[in-house]
């Protein structure tokens, strides 16, 4: 038998950290939002949990770093093949996302002054890779998951997206399959 699940916001998981930060932003604007996350696997088994290095994002502007410089480093690192407008938007959101994770209680590595610690990474021209020991992805995932669960987000594990119903450019529904049972 097929179940019908209703929500105000359906997030189909691609990258754990990204969808969780998106959810957090939306929930802050509308705390009564009914959110459902669809995932093929448990969040703790996602690729995000395997990431060790850190999160590139400008959190310290005092040493000449900027969103534009972060964008340039990213575009250069992508051999100038990446969409520059999208990259700039992403870079502008990375620093605030790191600060939001810090606010949520993510145990970042710290400087002696207590600030989120950053290190050089990936050929960037400035030190902006914010990290949590060598388990950044795992810790990001669990920080976001803890916050989501404490705010009533519903998770549909072991489900995959088959189709979406679009009306006038707006998603009005989704067809999912339970991977374990095959039910639609």
Where are the regions a protein language model picked out?
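N-terminal Rossmann-fold NAD(P) dinucleotide-binding loop
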Residues: 13, 17
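Conserved N-terminal Rossmann-fold NAD(P)-binding element of oxidoreductases
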Residues: 7-12
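Conserved N-terminal/central alpha/beta ligand/cofactor-binding core
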Residues: 32-34, 39-180
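Short, small-residue-biased leader/transition segments that mark boundaries at the very start
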Residues: 1-6
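Generic hydrophobic/aromatic pocket-lining and core-packing "Φ" positions
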Residues: 18-21, 98
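A short, Lys/Arg-enriched amphipathic alpha-helix followed by its capping loop at the start of a domain
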Residues: 20-33
């Amino acid at each position: 038998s097929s179940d019908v699940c209703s929500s105000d916001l359906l997030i189909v998981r691609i990258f754990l950290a990204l969808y969780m930060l998106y959810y957090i932003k939306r929930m802050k604007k509308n705390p009564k939002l009914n959110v459902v996350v669809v995932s093929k696997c448990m969040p703790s088994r996602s690729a995000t949990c395997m990431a060790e290095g850190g999160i590139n994002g400008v959190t310290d502007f005092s040493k000449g770093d900027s969103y534009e410089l972060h964008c340039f480093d990213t575009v250069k690192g992508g051999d100038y093949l990446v969409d520059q407008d999208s990259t700039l938007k992403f870079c502008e959101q990375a620093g605030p996302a790191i600060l939001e994770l810090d606010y949520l209680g993510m145990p970042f590595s710290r400087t002696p002054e207590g600030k989120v610690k950053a290190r050089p990474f990936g050929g960037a021209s400035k030190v902006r890779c914010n990290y949590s020991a060598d388990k950044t992805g795992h810790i990001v995932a669990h920080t976001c998951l803890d916050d989501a669960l404490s705010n009533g987000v519903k998770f549909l594990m072991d489900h995959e997206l088959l189709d979406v119903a679009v009306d006038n450019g707006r998603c009005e529904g989704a067809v999912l399959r339970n991977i374990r049972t095959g039910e639609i």
